Amino acid sequence: MAIVKVTDADFDSKVESGVQLVDFWATWCGPCKMIAPVLEELAADYEGKADILKLDVDENPSTAAKYEVMSIPTLIVFKDGQPVDKVVGFQPKENLAEVLDKHL
C-alpha cells in the first residue's frame, strides 16, 4: 500500500484500528525529505501488516498539537487508535522496522 496522506479531519478514522506509523512532517523540513524514501520502503515491506501515514503539521496543526509534536519529523506508532511508540528525527529503516515490529 502506498503512503496515505491524512488531515485533521480524517486522522482519527485512519488510526482507529490496526497499526499505523504516522509521519508528522512539513514541506520545508530537510530531515523530513530525507526520511521519505525510507517510509516508501516501509510501506511496501509492511503492506497488509501496518499502514504508513503522513500528516503535514503546517496544514493540520490541531492533530500535531494533540500529540505534542514539537520537532519534526516525529513518527508515532498507533495501535487501535492509541499512540504506543514515538521517535523523533531521521531514523534508518532498520530502526523504524524494529519499532513497528514491537506492535504487530
From Swiss-Prot:
Keyword Disulfide bond: yes
Any Pfam family matching the protein: Thioredoxin
Gene Ontology BP annotations: cell redox homeostasis
CC terms in the record's Gene Ontology section: cytosol
Positions of disulphide bridges: C29-C32
PROSITE patterns: THIOREDOXIN_1, THIOREDOXIN_2
Domain Thioredoxin residue range list: 2-104
CDD domains: TRX_family (cd02947)
Inducing stimuli: Expressed in both aerobic and anaerobic conditions.
Protein keywords: Disulfide bond, Electron transport, Redox-active center, Transport
Domain of life: Bacteria
Role noted for this protein: Component of the thioredoxin-thioredoxin reductase system. Participates in various redox reactions through the reversible oxidation of its active center dithiol to a disulfide and catalyzes dithiol-disulfide exchange reactions.
Family: Belongs to the thioredoxin family.
Name by which UniProt lists this protein: Thioredoxin
Organism: Staphylococcus aureus
